[in-house]
């Protein structure tokens, strides 16, 4: 039987703007990716942010766990759980790499075109809500 793959996405804020990375197709997303075997949500989030955005981060809490087929398009053929993780930036800077061509911080009102397979504008808005909350409760499907 099929079991879900797990994806982690990092929410990193600076001056009330969220960090997004632009991929080779021109679309933007929260830094993140598939959780590899032997990785945890915590360790994978750190790894993916370092690879895609050049930053070292400290994951602080899980914002949400979403079922991809309910919220993202197009849906995958297999089940996917998407985790959104609030992270504190520690150090580092962006370097172009094989996965991403640039990174930038965006206000909620100025979000660029998104790769909605990875995250939707509504999911980014949820990250802003968590950022503004002093007592966030993890949301899950």
Can you say where each PLM-predicted feature lies in the sequence?
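Short, hydrophobic/aromatic-rich beta-strand segments within well-structured domains
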Residues: 9-11, 19-21, 83-86
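Aromatic-lined ligand-binding clefts that engage carbohydrates, nucleic acids, or primary amines
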Residues: 132
